[in-house]
């Protein structure tokens, strides 16, 4: 049986559960008899092992099973009778004081789900991101595609695209191959020496002083110059120090970017090389990417608004569970990138804020969906998968990938559900359009 529910905190509750010892003993004996039918022991036939031996071997385990079952049943009945929605799992502890003779007592401490009160959606303020894909953005994207297809040719040597001109010195946009050695106070340092090292001048891969020391050299020439490492340089051993570098230029290659012609269009998948079709294809891909990013920004604004108008306490146990899930996800992601995660600390507090937001939003979304019947419809899920498939070479394989696995389809359903909530809120809230520059939306990726 269980006592009345005690309120320990806003969401924390406690129930005391008592179980008669005689009831436990009766059930233990019953289960031992069942177990004895199949127990084997040296010198005895199956099912003929003395009950005393069976009890010695399995008694402790079965007693724990019986107690867990009795306490679990009483806990479930008590929470059901009191209409409590339990968050996470209860903490069960034996109670040793003020216990009647012939009974066992346990305290079950747990948290309950809060009453979710979503505020007035009409008072919510949401920013809807607006971005225009103009001809200038299409031109920038085509330039990026050209740079991705650049070919390098040795300066001074004839190629199908010329010899790079009469200037045989290294300049910005050239790819150079060098030998270099760096010293600090006359001593070489780790990472300060290499042979046959290639990089493109002007891309910013090397420190500006290093690139400046390379520009203007011809093949075979050497140069010695000082270089000051920034205080925040990633190499702690040299950060903030001044080194002396000697470089020898081994090779200079000039960059040839393809012309925007039929061959270039074909390299982008336009079979007949039609440039108008190419631009239309680039525009379509850009608009798809912009649409996805705009939706993501607008969704974030909607979620922020929902959090702002909805005040309630979040069960700590759910935050802890989500924190652990985020930690494990981060650990797996870093391991897949080849990092040795066993030596890295993962303080839970790094993930707590994000975990609380995710749990809070999950509770809010569930309430909005339930209150307004915004569940994902099968036709919506199908349309979303088909939209995903458009971005791939073989759409049928993408469709098969999702529809052959219920868990993958559940991920799509969750996205559709979120979109339903976003659209519903946009129809109720105070929505202000916010124009955003293309480059800002794309994180300056359009600059190449």
UniProtKB/Swiss-Prot annotation:
Its main location: cytoplasm. It catalyses: [protein]-peptidylproline (omega=180) = [protein]-peptidylproline (omega=0). GO terms for cellular component: cytoplasm. Its EC number is 5.2.1.8. InterPro entries: PPIase_dom_sf (IPR046357), PPIase_FKBP_dom (IPR001179), Trig_fac (IPR005215), Trigger_fac_C (IPR008880), Trigger_fac_C_sf (IPR037041), Trigger_fac_ribosome-bd_bac (IPR008881), Trigger_fac_ribosome-bd_sf (IPR036611), Trigger_fact/SurA_dom_sf (IPR027304). PROSITE patterns: FKBP_PPIASE. Transmembrane segments: none annotated. Gene3D superfamilies: 3.10.50.40, Trigger factor ribosome-binding domain, Trigger factor, C-terminal domain. Keywords: Cell cycle, Cell division, Chaperone, Cytoplasm, Isomerase, Rotamase. The keyword Chaperone applies. Residues 173-258 form the PPIase FKBP-type domain. GO terms for biological process: 'de novo' cotranslational protein folding; cell division; chaperone-mediated protein folding; protein transport; protein unfolding. GO terms for molecular function: peptidyl-prolyl cis-trans isomerase activity; protein folding chaperone; ribosome binding. Involved in protein export. Acts as a chaperone by maintaining the newly synthesized protein in an open conformation. Functions as a peptidyl-prolyl cis-trans isomerase. Belongs to the FKBP-type PPIase family. Tig subfamily. Consists of 3 domains; the N-terminus binds the ribosome, the middle domain has PPIase activity, while the C-terminus has intrinsic chaperone activity on its own. This is Trigger factor. It comes from Herminiimonas arsenicoxydans.
């Amino acid at each position: 049986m269980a006592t009345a529910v005690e309120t320990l905190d806003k969401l924390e509750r406690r129930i005391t559960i008592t179980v008669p010892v005689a009831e436990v003993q009766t059930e233990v004996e019953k289960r031992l008899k069942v177990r004895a039918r199949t127990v084997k022991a040296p010198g005895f036939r199956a099912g003929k092992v003395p009950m005393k031996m069976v009890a010695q071997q399995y008694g402790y385990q079965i007693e724990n099973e019986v107690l867990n079952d009795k306490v679990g049943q009483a806990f479930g009945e008590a929470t059901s009778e009191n209409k409590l929605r339990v968050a996470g799992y209860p903490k069960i502890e034996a109670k040793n004081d003020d216990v009647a003779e012939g009974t066992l007592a346990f305290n079950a401490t747990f948290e309950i789900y809060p009453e979710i009160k979503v505020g007035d959606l009409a008072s919510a303020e949401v920013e809807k991101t607006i971005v225009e894909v103009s001809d200038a953005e299409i031109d920038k994207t085509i330039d990026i595609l050209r740079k991705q297809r650049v070919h390098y040719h040795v300066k001074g040597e004839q190629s199908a695209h010329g010899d790079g001109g009469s200037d045989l010195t290294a300049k910005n946009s050239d790819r150079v191959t060098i030998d270099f050695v760096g010293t600090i106070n006359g001593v070489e340092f780790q990472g300060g020496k290499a042979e046959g090292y290639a990089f493109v001048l002007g891309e910013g891969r090397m420190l500006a002083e290093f690139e400046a020391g390379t520009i203007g050299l011809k093949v075979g020439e050497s140069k010695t110059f000082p270089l000051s490492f920034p205080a925040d340089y990633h190499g702690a051993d040299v950060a903030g120090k001044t080194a002396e570098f000697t470089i020898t230029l081994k090779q200079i290659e000039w960059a040839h970017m393809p012309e925007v012609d039929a061959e270039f269009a074909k390299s982008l998948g336009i079979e007949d090389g039609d440039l108008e079709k190419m631009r239309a294809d680039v525009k379509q891909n850009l608009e798809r990417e912009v649409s996805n990013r705009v939706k993501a920004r607008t969704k974030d604004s909607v979620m922020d608004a929902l959090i702002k108008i909805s005040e309630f306490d979040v069960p700590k146990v759910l935050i802890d569970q989500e924190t652990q899930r985020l930690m494990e996800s981060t650990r797996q992601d870093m391991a897949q990138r080849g990092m040795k995660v066993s030596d890295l600390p993962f303080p839970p507090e790094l993930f707590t804020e994000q975990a609380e937001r995710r749990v809070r939003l999950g509770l809010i979304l569930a309430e909005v969906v339930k209150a307004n019947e915004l569940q994902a419809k099968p036709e919506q899920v199908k349309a979303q998968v088909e939209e995903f498939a458009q971005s791939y070479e073989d759409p049928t394989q993408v469709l098969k990938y999702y529809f052959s696995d219920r868990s993958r389809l559940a991920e799509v359903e969750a996205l559709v559900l979120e979109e339903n909530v976003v659209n519903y809120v946009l129809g109720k809230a105070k929505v202000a359009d916010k124009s955003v520059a293309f480059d800002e939306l794309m994180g300056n990726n359009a600059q190449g």
